[in-house]
A protein has these predicted regions:
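Short aromatic/hydrophobic contact patches that present stacked aromatics
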Residues: 109-111, 139-141, 174
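Acetyl-CoA-dependent GNAT
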Residues: 19, 23-29, 34-117, 123-128, ...
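Conserved GNAT acetyl-CoA-binding A-motif
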Residues: 133-144
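Short hydrophobic/aromatic beta-strand or adjacent loop that forms the aromatic wall/cage
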Residues: 74, 170-176
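Conserved N-terminal entry element of GNAT/NAT acetyltransferase domains
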Residues: 2-30, 178
Length: 178
């Protein structure tokens, strides 16, 4: 049992050493788009209308990625493991309505391949994102059915504000880290 724990700990440390967070560059656009499409489907299948699930194809995600990377209000970072995109974060320096928190940056998207969950990739992306937007105060909307994401955000210091909204994916909860 002790040997198993040590082995798991060593694997976790090795994972951290091979994963790096970098600003997105054109050479990574397609891989990021594929991760976005795949994680979107995994998360939303069976929870939202199928036509909305099907809308986020790699081609559509690539179009979004190009637009977000070119927007000076946005920051797009990717997590690379052995030169393979395994996750990404998108932040806005100025939050979109209905968020009324001019002091905060908006964490608009955070997706990590399921195989990389619980290895520190999400936390590293959020930390790097805060540094990239030069703002420690973050606000986000998380869909109500995604209790895993809610738990992750609580674990890294976010809490619910009590504000909610309803979008295509259903009810969403506002969370902040300050």
């Amino acid at each position: 049992m002790i040997h198993e724990r040590a082995s798991l700990r060593q694997r976790h440390i090795m994972q951290d050493m091979t994963t790096r967070i970098v600003p997105i560059e054109p050479q990574w656009f397609m891989q990021k788009a594929e991760v976005q499409s795949r994680t979107w489907r995994e998360l939303n299948q069976g929870h939202i209308p199928q036509d909305i699930v099907d809308a986020i194809t790699p081609a559509f995600a690539l179009k979004l990625t190009r637009g977000h990377a070119a927007d000076p209000n946005q920051v797009v970072l990717i997590a690379l493991a052995d030169d393979r995109v395994v996750g990404f974060i998108e932040l806005l320096r100025t939050p979109r309505p209905p968020i009324n928190r001019p002091e905060a940056a908006e964490l608009a998207s955070l997706y990590v391949l399921e195989s990389e969950h619980r290895h520190g990739v999400g936390r590293a992306l959020v930390e790097a994102g805060r540094q990239a937007v030069c703002n420690d105060r973050l606000v986000l909307w998380v869909v109500g059915f995604n209790t895993n994401a809610q738990g992750f955000y609580r674990h890294i210091g976010f809490h619910e504000t009590g504000l909610t909204q309803t979008e295509d994916m259903g009810p969403e909860i506002e969370m902040i880290n300050y």
